[in-house]
């Protein structure tokens, strides 16, 4: 038997642990939306509006588009498909391709849903995957800008959570779930990963852990930085689609990219938004 003070202390400890534990996911009406955001802290799914950028507007990434769409189509039809890692330069269309391809395929596959999970909430993935496992819908789970940053044991625990979710434990991976991650890094390694202070063996073990996470993605698709002709082609495609005519279009587009120090699909789209606003035209 325990004394009253010990019992009270144990109750307080149990209450504190319950507050710290992730909330159990609350199943929404998935018919209400096709895109969702998962809030792991609250255990809630938040409906999001449909993604508006058409798939055919993504130019300069034709090979990447074809590979991703083929894999997604297989998944939506219940055929074997691989989890996907989209890696490469910032602003090259990794996240846009995922959402635009999803919207395109969802028009033909009513049961398809996309759920976005924040990279800081990877610890909730195993629980989320188990929650979705027996649903009739088919889910694309997207983690944008995935990487494992140095921190107090945060790096390897996040990697292990992702691996556990993708592998599915003794139950195996969910058949109705496709995991897609975007990253600037092919092996999801933090830049300047510091071996000093932790010891070479511990640092090497961390590195092996992170590389083993990338190996869980059966399909790797790289996105190189845009060259100038591809960037201008993207600008012209956007301008033609939205009826934005300008004799000095190329010159202005190049000035825009030079001011930002980058050429990418994102920069091209930002230029078009600026041009449309200048002309008083809605996109």
Identify the residue ranges that each predicted region occupies.
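C-terminal alpha-helical "lid" subdomain
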Residues: 2, 22-26, 224-283
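Interdomain "pre-motor" coupling segment immediately N-terminal to P-loop NTPase/helicase cores
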Residues: 2-46
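Dynamic helix-loop-helix/coil hinge segments at AAA+ ATPase domain boundaries and subdomain interfaces
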Residues: 4-5, 43-67
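Phosphate-binding P-loop
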Residues: 47-49, 73-81
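Walker A/P-loop nucleotide-binding motif
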Residues: 78-100
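AAA+/P-loop NTPase substrate/partner-engagement loops
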Residues: 104-139, 148-153
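Conserved catalytic/switch belt of AAA+ P-loop NTPases
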Residues: 148-200, 205
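Conserved AAA+ ATPase "SRH/arginine-finger" region at the nucleotide-binding site
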Residues: 183, 199-211, 218-230
